């Protein structure tokens, strides 16, 4: 049995669920307005542009962009959306990462973090993860049909944005409700946080967090602010 820690382990462990890795297929299954590069949007608005597949994670290539239904010719000729990427309607709201455990035939939330971005101009760079009581969102029946050991789902408010066939909130296991986890980004100033507990990355090899140059923001670890209330 393969020990599933990262998404590439899940790809090998659960070949029957590899469609979950296809973020475009997931978006369409959820009923969102979405399409691949080469297909025009049907309405004006902001969209999230992402690779169809990104088992590495960390928001590689993801960005927010305004697209117009008047750009049909341009978009059909691969302008605005890179090949291998897709567009999906943009959802405002709070970003949640929720871990689930299997109870009978259902997935039940067991822990959760709320992610706060520094800016919507950079979807990789979270400013803070806050440990919260897990919210209960209604999941589609087909999500409950996914039979794996662990499940992590990311949301914008109650809208599913990603499903991972593994746990995602390991930091919750050693934290309490109200604790705040601050990612430490290379080049940023954290003088005001140096009194806090520092939690290093799982791997000590910095190259593991550069995605071979595909990430310009390199995470060095975390500072944890304990909730004392």
How would you describe each model-predicted region?
Residues 58, 106-107, 116-229:
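ATP-dependent carboxylate activation and anion-phosphoryl transfer catalytic cores
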Residues 2-141:
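Active-site nucleotide/adenylate-binding loops and adjacent lid/helix of ATP-dependent enzymes
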């Amino acid at each position: 049995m393969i020990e599933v820690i990262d998404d590439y382990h899940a790809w090998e462990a659960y070949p029957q669920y590899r469609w979950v890795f296809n973020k475009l297929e997931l978006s369409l299954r959820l009923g969102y307005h979405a399409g691949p590069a080469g297909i025009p949007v049907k309405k004006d608005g902001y969209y999230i542009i992402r690779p169809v597949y990104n088992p590495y994670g960390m928001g590689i290539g993801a960005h927010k962009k305004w697209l117009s239904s008047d750009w049909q010719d341009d978009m059909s000729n691969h302008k605005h959306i890179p090949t291998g990427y897709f567009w999906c309607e943009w959802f405002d709201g709070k970003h949640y990462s929720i871990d689930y455990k299997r109870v009978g035939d259902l997935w039940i939330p067991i822990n959760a973090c709320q992610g706060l971005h520094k800016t919507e101009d950079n979807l990789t760079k979270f400013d803070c993860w806050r440990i919260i009581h897990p919210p209960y969102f209604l999941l589609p029946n087909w999500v409950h049909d996914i039979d794996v050991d662990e499940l992590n789902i990311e949301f914008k408010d109650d809208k599913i944005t990603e499903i991972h066939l593994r746990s995602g909130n390991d930091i919750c296991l050693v934290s309490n409700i109200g604790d705040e986890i601050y990612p430490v980004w290379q080049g940023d100033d954290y003088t005001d946080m140096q009194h806090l507990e520092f939690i290093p990355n799982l791997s000590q090899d910095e190259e593991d967090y550069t995605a071979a140059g595909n990430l310009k923001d390199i995470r060095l670890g975390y500072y944890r602010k304990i909730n004392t209330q």
